[in-house]
Amino acid sequence: MTKTFRTLDDVDVKGKRVLLRVDLNVPMDAGKVTDTTRLERVMPTITELSGKGAKVILLAHFGRPKGRDDKNSLKPVAAALADVIKKPVGFADDCIGEPAAKAIAAMADGDILCLENTRFHPEEEKNDPAFVAKLAELGDIWVNDAFSAAHRAHATTEGLGHKLPAYAGRTMQAELVALNKALEAPVKPVIAIVGGAKVSTKIDLLENLVTKVQALVIGGGMANTFLHAQGVKVGKSLCEKDLAPTALRILDKAEAANCAIILPVDATVAYHFEANAPSFAYGLDAIPDDAMILDVGPRSIERIHAAIDDAATLVWNGPVGAFELTPFDKGTVEAAKHAAKRTKAGKLVSVAGGGDTVAALNHAGVADDFTYISTAGGAFLEWMEGKPLPGVEVLQVK
């Protein structure tokens, strides 16, 4: 990802038909958009292109339709987008063919048009060359501003980059710059915090991180698997016992790479998985057989703080406890607040991503204090795993 990629600074868009791939996959309830975060994220690129006199043609998917399906139409999303950007947004009820061509032909410079859900055509996800060619006829250049879909080699996220001059939008550019700063060319030492329920979903991520960071904090349910692998009795806690050999392999790999692994040294446990259940802090040698670990304990929180203090860069994915239940949010909230404080003091570059992580940082009230928050989900994880992202690769200057 340290390779260079073309941005909007490299192209004159006046009078050009710009096919702009955006992420409009917003939550809906009864035909109304309930969270406009993703619409706000695409606003800078749309308004810049429109202001420079481009004909801005939006391409996006919505949901997982099997063919045309009105409840996955982008029409209400286009209306919500118009409210957010405070500009009219036209709508065409297909993304190819006559409806799209006619609507585009009627555009004036600076106009914005949203084409219908690209996934109404199964060829979108197959990256079908004939479908890509039909889309390419509608534009002069392609701008990808959907990092969240960059791990998919679909027609509108990757295929168009082989047919039209390709550029990164401002949201994509910001994401690539932030991620590059965090793992590819970071200020060292780098610490990663990885939490969440299961090791099984994050094996590739852990194996990549131990070769890139100087310290790795493992928390959440997945820490129990590592503790079990080391002979700790974890009671009724969530634990993937069959992955003990995998956990030991990751620990060995970390040691060989000189990456310090920071596991819990104590735990906050309860007998019931529910909010405000009576909870107790125990050392790892005393976890009751009928209790479950739901958060890191007070000494573990101190260790996480110390690790953050020693770091210049932090990459975070996944909560370190059952943060959705009080009081088992304490470890995650305190670590988040500590990282935010260091960031605000100019002592830490902090990058976080993944759905649960963003929710946890919002819950802690510190999301705005991190250097960068990625809303990308799957693409953020694949980047952390060190995998090439097709929608980014195609933007790079060869």
UniProtKB/Swiss-Prot annotation:
Keyword Transferase (UniProt): yes
Keyword Metal-binding tagged: no
Pathway where it operates: Carbohydrate degradation; glycolysis; pyruvate from D-glyceraldehyde 3-phosphate: step 2/5
Catalytic activity, as annotated: (2R)-3-phosphoglycerate + ATP = (2R)-3-phospho-glyceroyl phosphate + ADP
Alphabetical UniProt keywords: ATP-binding, Cytoplasm, Glycolysis, Kinase, Nucleotide-binding, Transferase
Broad class of the protein's primary localization: cytoplasm
Residues that, per the record, bind ATP: K202, E324, G354, G355, D356, T357
EC number: 2.7.2.3
Subunit structure comment from the entry: Monomer.
Family classification: Belongs to the phosphoglycerate kinase family.
Name the UniProt record assigns to this protein: Phosphoglycerate kinase
Organism field: Rhodopseudomonas palustris (strain ATCC BAA-98 / CGA009)
